[in-house]
């Protein structure tokens, strides 16, 4: 196949055999968010480039290296969204839905785009589910977001495989004081830092704390600590969050080097990490961004949120063997009909079954075929039962019901009793 007819590197198709797991995961998250009172918002995948420069920060890796940016026919610079928070903030500002202190608890799902080196668990087009809350500034809402994700891990059966890491970045003023102290310390040890950290020292020194270079990490052992520069309000907020997590029985560790890769965070930051996926260990991350709305032209409005990577969490479910067997069955019943009159009766019967059993997953054979070929297709479909309708059954207004996945003989069931019989048989299968 020529290159022009292949998917772009790092942008993957989700094939039919993969879709049930995606639907299961997305449905589980959406259902949980509904129970917590969150409303869905949908934003475009393309925004003006300036939005991300103002929100994420011009000297971040995302803006400098990773964004898909292009000029449209009007000469405007546009960018495929690399993350969801900025677009969500833009939307609530544009439509005025956080005015007068109105609380908004929102969630979204969709594709994000970053030009990174593709590897296991990291792609150029990837999917996120994110949550954003506006106009609530206490540690209680921070705790709710973390408790919500902890409950999700329980529903998915992966609580034992993830760990919560917490930190507080304080206010922008506190970070500025810390930044000055950190720059002074590291400038005196510049030659001991890796090349990337030397570059970041001038542009975004807090990101050096997250360096993976062992020599840089050795230097950081003696560096000033962010917690020593926190303002009192941030300290109280962080203690309040930890107290609530303790009360909820959610284990956590403090990671003083956790700073996140986006400039807009303040006070609480957190990550859920796993050691089951190799280097790509973060599956969910978030924090507070109390100054972002004002920074983007709105009135002072507090914000807090998180985003989770769907690809990584699905990979984690597969790695741990936590994929429910039931989701791989697409069809409950496969109807085989032999002869034109049986086919016509089968169509009427199948639609009657759909009326009476709205959740029934029923496939009707298409394209005709012999008994052997139709039965082979029924078995291959993964259905629990085959319905068999021929001239003999048609004359008696009956239909054959044959188990495909377990023990049991074929039974002939009267048409008017079929719906009730099927419902019971599927429930017991």
UniProtKB/Swiss-Prot annotation:
GO terms for molecular function: ATP binding; histidine-tRNA ligase activity. GO terms for biological process: histidyl-tRNA aminoacylation. Keywords: Aminoacyl-tRNA synthetase, ATP-binding, Cytoplasm, Ligase, Nucleotide-binding, Protein biosynthesis. It holds the Pfam family tRNA-synt_His. It catalyses: tRNA(His) + L-histidine + ATP = L-histidyl-tRNA(His) + AMP + diphosphate + H(+). HAMAP family: His_tRNA_synth (MF_00127). This is Histidine--tRNA ligase. It comes from Pseudomonas putida (strain W619).
């Amino acid at each position: 196949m020529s290159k022009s007819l292949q998917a772009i590197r790092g942008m993957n198709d989700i094939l039919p055999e993969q879709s049930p797991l995606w639907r299961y995961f997305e449905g589980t998250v959406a259902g949980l968010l509904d129970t917590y009172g969150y409303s869905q918002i949908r934003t475009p995948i393309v925004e003006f480039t300036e939005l991300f420069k103002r929100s994420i920060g011009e000297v971040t890796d995302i803006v400098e290296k990773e964004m898909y940016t292009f000029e449209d026919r009007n000469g405007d610079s546009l960018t495929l969204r690399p993350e969801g928070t900025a677009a969500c903030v833009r939307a609530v500002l544009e439509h005025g839905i956080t005015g007068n202190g109105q609380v908004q608890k929102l969630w979204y799902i969709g594709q994000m785009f970053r030009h990174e080196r593709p590897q296991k668990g990291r792609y150029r087009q990837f999917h996120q589910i994110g949550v954003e809350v506006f106009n609530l500034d206490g540690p209680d809402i921070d705790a709710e977001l973390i408790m919500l994700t902890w409950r999700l891990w329980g529903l998915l059966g992966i609580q034992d495989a993830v760990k919560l890491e917490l930190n507080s970045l304080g206010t922008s003023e506190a970070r500025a004081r810390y930044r000055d102290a950190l720059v002074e310390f590291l400038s005196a040890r510049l030659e001991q830092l890796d090349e990337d950290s030397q570059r970041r020292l001038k542009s975004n020194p807090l990101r050096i704390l997250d360096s993976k270079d062992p020599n840089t990490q050795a230097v950081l052992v003696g560096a000033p600590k962010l917690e020593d520069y926190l303002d009192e309000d941030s300290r109280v907020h962080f203690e309040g969050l930890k107290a609530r997590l303790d009360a909820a029985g959610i284990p956590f560790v403090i990671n003083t080097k956790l700073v996140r890769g986006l400039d807009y965070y303040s006070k609480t930051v957190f990550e859920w990490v796993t050691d089951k996926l190799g280097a790509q260990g973060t599956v969910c991350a978030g924090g507070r961004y109390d100054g972002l709305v004002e920074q983007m032209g709105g009135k002072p409005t507090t914000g807090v949120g998180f985003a989770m990577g769907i690809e990584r969490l699905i990979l984690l479910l597969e790695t741990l063997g936590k994929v429910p067997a039931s989701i791989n069955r697409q069809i409950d019943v496969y109807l085989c009909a032999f002869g034109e009159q049986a086919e016509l009766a089968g169509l009427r019967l199948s639609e009657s079954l759909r009326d009476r059993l709205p959740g029934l997953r029923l496939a009707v054979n298409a394209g005709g075929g012999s008994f052997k070929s139709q039965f082979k297709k029924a078995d291959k479909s993964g259905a629990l039962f085959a319905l068999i309708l021929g001239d003999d059954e048609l004359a008696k207004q009956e239909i054959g019901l044959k188990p495909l996945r377990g023990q049991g003989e074929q039974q002939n069931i009267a048409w008017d009793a079929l719906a009730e019989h099927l419902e019971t048989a599927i429930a017991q299968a």
